[in-house]
Amino acid sequence: MKITTPHGTLEGDNIEAILKEHGFDCLRGADLSDADLRGADLRDANLRDANLSHANHVKLSIAKISILPNEGDIIGWKKAWTDNEMPPTPVIVKLLIPADAQRSNATGRKCRASTARVLDLQDKQGNSLPPDTTAYSGYDTDFTYKKGETIHVEDFDTNRWKECAPGIHFFITRIEAVEY
């Protein structure tokens, strides 16, 4: 198998052998168009900017790394911060991602949504904070989280492979948000 990347051509018996020899980032920007991905284990592979058009078994490979359900509401968790003290205190935000929200995850565990309802603000131990608590995004301090409010991101990026693109970032397990 040969794979063309921005850094040259990689060769190996199969895609797993190439990943083993060159590392998980070797596929970044790779041309995988028309590739046979049957049975390929792409967990942890960096496919950012990779061309997967017409690749064999792409839908199955994507399904294996997709962690979000395609339908129904889901609960998401994210870490945010209070700013009423220094250093800021971490806050765990419990979100309801509605069924009609745009949602995405790339190849990792971090997810994004276009809209969410703030169900609760908690300390790291899981205790609910007072209802008037405001939490702030660690990325954009103008983006706030208040219990009961519905929040939106107008410029949600629909490209699922852009993990850190615009969106409400969250995890599907609480412990991942706590440890982030």
Predicted features along the sequence, with ranges:
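Intrinsic low-complexity/IDR segments
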Residues: 1-34, 38, 43, 48-180
